[in-house]
């Protein structure tokens, strides 16, 4: 019984770690912290060419 509960806790922890890794892996593509071009940011916000959102 003890080994089963430990196994379940480990599985839950692994699931949490994997679910927490996903946003971190996706974040650089969505919001680049060192943005090379500020126009890129406005373009992603879909503000249009008037706001420098030229793609």
Curated annotation (Swiss-Prot):
Query: Any idea which GO molecular function terms this record carries?
Result: hormone activity
Q: Where is the signal peptide?
A: 1-19
Any single biological process term in GO: regulation of female receptivity, post-mating
Q: Does the keyword Secreted apply?
A: yes
Disulphide bonds in the chain:
43-55
Q: Which InterPro entries match?
A: Sex_peptide (IPR012608)
Q: Where in the cell does this protein reside?
A: Secreted
Sorted keywords for this record are: Behavior, Disulfide bond, Hydroxylation, Secreted, Signal
Checking Pfam families in the record gives: Sex_peptide (PF08138)
Source superkingdom: Eukaryota
Instruction: Give the chief site where it resides.
Output: secreted
According to the UniProt entry, which residues carry Hydroxyproline? 28, 32, 34, 38
Q: Which GO terms describe its cellular component?
A: extracellular region
Provide the tissue specificity: Main cells of the accessory glands of males (paragonial gland).
Q: What does the protein in this record do?
A: Represses female sexual receptivity and stimulates oviposition.
- What is this protein called in UniProt? Accessory gland-specific peptide 70A
